[in-house]
Amino acid sequence: MNKLLEYITNPLFLALIVFLVLLLTFNILQRLGRGRAWKQIAAETGLQFSKHRTATYRDQQLSGIYRERSLALIESVSEEYDADRRRSERGDNRTNTDTDIRLKINVPQGIKMKLNRVITIGEATRVTGNAEIDRHFNITSEPDWLAPKVLTSANVRQKLPRLKMGGNIFVQEAELLFNQLGRISDGKYLRFLLDFLSDLADAVEGCRYG
C-alpha cells in the first residue's frame, strides 16, 4: 500500500496524468469546434451535413451542390477512398484519417493535373512562367499546357497564395480532388478551399481541348 501511495504521488506520475487530461480536453474541444465549423458551413452553403462510420469513429461529411457543381467534403480513412489511386500517388495505404474534397468536372478522358505547395531551395523549375507560382508550388499536368493556363487565370492566381502546406490537388478521371492528411478544424480555411477548388474546376473546364 505504501509503495502504491509513493507511486501515485510521484511528481512524474502526477505530471503525466495532468498532461493526459489536458491532451484529452484539447482533443474534445477541437472536435466540438470542428463540428460547429462544419455545421456553420452547411447552414451558409446549403450543403448537407452528416456523419459516416469509419474504422475509428463517426467522421463528418458535407455533400450536395455548391456553385452548380457536385461536391463532397469528407473525413475518411483508407477504406473510404480508392486505395489503388492513393497508393500510386502517395505510396501508402492511408491508415490515418484524411480530409478529402471532391468536385465533379466535365473534361475529356486523360486530362490530369497535380498541384501542391512546396519549399523550394535554389532555382525553381519553370512551369507557368510566373516566378512566385513556380517557386512555391510543385506542378505537373497532361497536357503540359494545362497547368500554366489554369494557374495563371485571374481567380485562381489571386487565391493560390492562401493554399497551405500539406494539401495535394489532383485532376483525374473527371474529378478534382483535394486531399490533406488529418482533419481540418478551421472553418474559414475550409470555406476558402471550397471557393478556390470551385474556381480551379471552372478554369480546368473552361480550357479548350483539341
Model-derived features with residue positions:
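Feature marks short, highly hydrophobic, charge-poor N-terminal signal-anchor/signal peptide-like helices
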Residues: 1-15
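Charged, low-complexity intrinsically disordered regions
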Residues: 38-67, 72-210
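Core hydrophobic alpha-helical membrane-spanning segments
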Residues: 16-22, 106
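Transmembrane-cytosolic junction motif
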Residues: 20-46
